[in-house]
UniProtKB/Swiss-Prot annotation:
The gene is noc. NCBIfam families: nucleoid_noc, parB_part. It comes from Bacillus pumilus (strain SAFR-032). Disulfide bonds: none annotated. Pfam families: HTH_ParB, ParBc. Its main location: cytoplasm. GO terms for cellular component: chromosome; cytoplasm; nucleoid. This is Nucleoid occlusion protein. Keywords: Cell cycle, Cell division, Cytoplasm, DNA-binding, Septation. CDD domains: SPO0J_N (cd16393). Residues 155-174 bind DNA. GO terms for biological process: chromosome segregation; division septum assembly; positive regulation of sporulation resulting in formation of a cellular spore. HAMAP family: ParB_Noc. Effects nucleoid occlusion by binding relatively nonspecifically to DNA and preventing the assembly of the division machinery in the vicinity of the nucleoid, especially under conditions that disturb the cell cycle. It helps to coordinate cell division and chromosome segregation by preventing the formation of the Z ring through the nucleoid, which would cause chromosome breakage.
Length: 291
């Protein structure tokens, strides 16, 4: 984790570049400086405000608690002091902390670090991303938060995480879907591929309607994609079809260039709405960009 974190912190603390070296040293010492480990009261520790995980499996927490009860805590949690004296905020190790609570232990071994909000958020986000246990929506929110914290492009973020840019872009597109669809992914009522199939519909009311149909009829991904195609065809059929003139070569090139540019804007994470209408003498392209 050290390599990924140092690269992020180097970008995230632009006013104090020397912090990159200091933080690398702190992370490297994590497992070696045993004198830093302290026994902290469990009830003095609060969850990480930047924790990307919103759902914790009670079964997994119980399994971890059983392991801890048998073998103890092998790796201490990491915390930072809060403004309230004697209180701490988790940086890493929330599952261990929750497991210890179920065991009703009074204290837990911890390492105290002096991290900023940006550093704390980055540790929490990257630690969870590397565990690959997040839902698609939680992962998407983690990517969005890292982009915001470190002022990165999607391409730069993908490089730093060792992932393909398309992987990051596809996850971020999920955040453009209505809240109902995102919640269905979190609750595992539909898969990520189901959700991605809904993106071309664009209109939230159509996406929600098909979501309900997927759940009620238990449609698989292929069936969902077929329904999307039909819904798009029906949407097109409702529009009046003007008499068409043949497109000139220059017009085709211009439209293709505009469409490619719009795709690039969408891939950057900006949600835009577009609508094309053909008239007898011209093509009208309406673009709505949020402020």
């Amino acid at each position: 984790m050290k390599h990924s974190l140092s690269r992020f912190f180097g970008l995230g603390d632009k006013e104090h570049p020397e912090r990159e070296t200091e933080i690398e040293a702190e992370i490297a010492e994590h497992d070696t400086l045993k004198e830093e480990i302290q026994e902290l009261p469990v009830d003095t520790i609060m969850p990480n405000r930047f924790q990307p995980r919103t759902i914790f499996s009670e079964e997994k927490i119980h399994e971890l608690a059983t392991t801890i009860h048998t073998h103890g805590i092998i790796q201490p949690i990491v915390v930072r002091p809060t403004e309230e004296e004697g209180k701490y905020e988790l940086i890493a190790g929330e599952r261990r902390w929750r497991a210890v609570q179920t065991l009703q232990w009074e204290k837990i071994p911890a390492i105290i670090k002096d991290f900023t909000d940006t550093e704390t958020a980055s540790v929490a986000l990257i630690e969870n991303l590397q565990r690959e246990e997040l839902s698609a929506i939680e992962e998407a929110h983690a990517y969005a938060r890292l982009l915001e914290l470190h002022d990165l492009t999607q391409e730069a973020l993908a490089q730093r995480l060792g992932k393909g840019q398309s992987t990051v872009a596809n996850k971020l597109r999920l955040l453009k879907l209505p809240e109902e669809v995102q919640q269905a992914i979190l609750e595992k009522k539909i898969s990520e591929r189901h959700a991605r199939s809904l993106v071309p519909l664009k209109l939230p009311e159509l996406q929600i309607a098909l979501l309900q149909e997927i759940i009620e009829k238990q449609l698989n991904v292929k069936q969902t994609e077929e329904r999307v195609v039909k819904m798009l065809e029906q949407k097109t059929d409702r529009k009046p079809r003007p008499k068409r003139k043949a497109f000139s070569r220059d017009t085709r090139i211009a439209m293709n260039t505009i469409r490619q540019s719009l795709h690039m804007v969408e891939d950057s994470g900006l949600k835009i709405n577009t609508e094309e209408e053909e008239f007898e003498e011209y093509i009208q392209l309406t673009i709505r960009i949020p402020k």
